[in-house]
Amino acid sequence: MTNPANPSPTLRVLVLAPTRRAASETFVRANLRRLPCKIVAYFGDERPLLAPLRLSYGLAILCSKALTRLGALRLATLPSSLVAWGLIRRHRPDVLMVEFGFHAVRVMEAAAWSGVPLVVHFRGSDASAQGRIGVLRERYQRLMKLVAGVIVKSQPMRAALLGLGAPADHLIVSPSGADEQLFGAAGSPKNAPPIFVAVGRFVAKKGPLLTIEAFGRMLQDLPDPLGRQARLVMVGEGPLWGEAKDLIASLGLKAAVSLEGVRSHKEVAQLLRGARAFVQHSLVAADGDSEGSPVAVMEAQLSGLPVVATRHGGIPEVVVEGATGFLVEEGDIAEMAKAMGRLALDSALAGRLGAAARIRAKGQFTVQHHLAQVGTLLAQVVWERRDRSPGG
């Protein structure tokens, strides 16, 4: 049998995800809709009374969560794994792909019982030493003995999982990438007004409050009339939205900062095309939550914008300091303000960095690149499992 470079349209993939909200994320949706495979997906928050399998799966995940909260980590695996095993028998997939590592430990025994190769897609805090790894270390070590393949978003995530025994030859670093269908049209930061755009949930790891503070400090140093022209546009919502609104008021930035709430991809793409730069102050949150490689950063670069961000997670693998943007240390508001100020003052510099960012994104960080890597891994683990089987 020849090892295929790409997945066959007949390849059957059973996808298990914790919630439908997770599936609404751009990167998960791309996996479900664009992989050239036969995909069936189940979600842990479903409770459809007229679909017994989906109801059973949702209830099993609920039970596993409750047992996890009680500290019965080994027992927590059984309800979900039993139902997942039933799903495998029902759908007979060639490969099982589970979204998020913390969800994989709930269903991992089903892969062991069935012999179906298991591929796990880690995305952020689920592969953070400060986050869930600390709580689930023993379970993750068991998971790494069962997986046939692992997908992560950044080199720090790769290092963390290698330390737990992940198979190095089947562990790929594959940022989710930007969608060229949505963000393929380039803006012109050289000709744009000094508008800075931030896109992301208002949660601690995205650092929205620090971004606002850095913008406010930048305004203090900008000469007129540039200081009166500069704007910060923030897209998203979340638990820190109220604090962000209060901070804007306390800093006297109501005229310069706008909170746009949730916007469609089309609207975000339009905002990016009219901006000077993209900004994001990612950092490790107090609870250990952290980023992989933020999709919004790649979308901004594909749109031709320079990026001002932090040396956090996989961001330094995407943003090249001084070539496609500027990087600062987590929590360094002064340096972030200075980097933003450079782009506000020098539109030609913004244009050069943005052009380089677009070239780099098109060459390495698109959804198409990501799906090609994922598809190849899925095909590889299936081929290897069949090759080792008695009839292979």
Role assignments for model-derived ranges:
Residues 156, 177:
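Carbohydrate-associated surface elements
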Residues 243-266:
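Nucleotide-activated donor-binding/catalytic signature segment of Leloir-type glycosyltransferases, i.e.
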Residues 1-55:
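N-terminal subdomain of nucleotide-sugar transferases
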Residues 98-104, 122:
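Short His-centered aromatic/hydrophobic patch
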Residues 273-288, 305:
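Acidic donor-binding loop of glycosyltransferase active sites
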Residues 318-322, 326-333, 342-348:
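Conserved acidic donor-binding segment of nucleotide-sugar-dependent glycosyltransferases
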Residues 297, 302, 306-309, 319:
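Short hydrophobic beta-strand element within catalytic cores of glycosyltransferases
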Residues 14, 187-217, 233:
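Conserved donor-binding/catalytic core segment of Leloir-type glycosyltransferases
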